[in-house]
Every structure is written in structure tokens, then in C-alpha cells.
Amino acid sequence: MKKYVIASILLISSLTSVAEDHFSGAFSIGAKGGVSLSQTTFSPSVPQKFHSGPMAGIMFRYIEENHFGLIGEVNFEQRGWKENFEEAPYSYSRDLSYIQIPLLAHIYFGSEKAKFFFNAGPEIGFMIAEKTNSNFDINNFSSLEGFPSENRNTEQFAMPIKHKVDYGKSAGIGAEWAINRRNSILIEGRFYYGLNNIFGANKKDIFAASNSIGIMASIGYFFRLK
């Protein structure tokens, strides 16, 4: 048994040495910006359209071996929901602004000039601001003419956010083009699925679920330090 352990250690060491001879790690920093399209998955459901908001952040990437690396980001992202009143002349949306911190596995393929990549991993977010936008009084709408309150949940209009820390998982695909050895630009589309509810979800609460989902489209720039 001892011989097998020693042999395994020697084999791993030799493979690592070979890999290091053929590939040197690369560390890059960058920035990105784009748009976030989001909804909140309510149960019972709330009629919605996509809520659009800005997103921007900084990126850190370490390529540790050929075709694989790690990405960490610190992003500002505005999510929320926008209610659908169909033909009624009313509007309501809630802006929820977060600092999002994803840690992603980075898998890429291609040449030195152009690469395609896939990113996936966990993400945590901290709500830093919220804002309600409406063209009616959210505390006194029952007397409004033609307001579609029948068969519609309205408690969320003025309900305070209970959970201001979100966590979930995200995955995205994109492409990167090298300008030269140290500079590159990229585009990415990413999907986020939140696992925490913004409102209470106990039996006594109105909503059994109120988690975020979002689609982010961004363009970014990387500068290679190493």
C-alpha cells in the first residue's frame, strides 16, 4: 500500500511539472457593464413584465491551466419586478439594487485570438437600496376607477423587503477577442436564479415564494497583469 501511495505522489508531481512546463498561469483584471432583465417569482403569481436595470462591475480572473480558470466579480446590479396591468393605465415597479459577488468556474476553448467560454458558480448579493415607482397611491388604490384588483395580489405594493441578502447560482456563455497579449474585450450573456426570498415565506405569510431570476447581457474588458 505504501508503495502505491509513493508511486501516486510521484506520478502527480511529474504530471504537475509537465503541465507547468507547457502552461503558465495568467492573472487579469477588468471591468464590464450592461443591462439586467429580471423578474421576481411569486407564489401565488403576480402578472409581470421584465424589469430592466443597469449593471456594472469589476472582474478578476486567474487561468491556472489550459481551458480552465476562476473568475471573481464585484458587481452593482439593479433587479426587481415590473407589474403587468395589460390595458389598464396603471404602472408599478420595484427597483432592488444589489452588490453581487459571484465566484465562477471559467471554461474556455479557442485560439489565442478568439475564445468561447462558459462560466458557472455560486453568487451572493447584498441589497443596498430599493425604490418604488408607480403612477397611483399604493396605499389607496381600491377606489381608483378601473383598477384591476380582482383576482390579483396587491399586498406586495407596499410590503417591506424582509430579506436583504440574496444567494443563488448563475451560468453564462460568451466570447472573448484578444487585442494584443495583454488586452482583450468580451461579451457575455448570463442567467441568475436566486434561492432566497425577498419576503417572508412562512405559513402565515402571503407569499410562499418571492425569489429573483435575471438575465444579464454585458460587454467587458480584461487587462492581463501576469
Predicted regions and their residues:
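Sec-dependent N-terminal signal peptides
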Residues: 4-13
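C-terminal segment of classical bacterial N-terminal signal peptides
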Residues: 13-19
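Short glycine/proline- and aromatic-enriched beta-strand/turn motifs that initiate or cap beta-hairpins
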Residues: 19-59, 162, 224-226
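Gram-negative (and chloroplast) outer-membrane scaffold detector with strong preference
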Residues: 23, 27, 61-142, 179-181, ...
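Residues that define the transmembrane beta-barrel architecture of outer-membrane proteins
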Residues: 25-27, 48-54, 95-101, 114, ...
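Flexible, solvent-exposed coil segments and beta strand-coil junctions
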Residues: 34-41, 80-87, 146-155, 195-201
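Extracellular loop and loop/strand-boundary signature of outer-membrane beta-barrel proteins
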Residues: 41-47, 86-92, 156-161, 202-207
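Predominantly the C-terminal beta-signal and adjacent terminal strand-loop region
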Residues: 146-148, 166, 171, 177-226
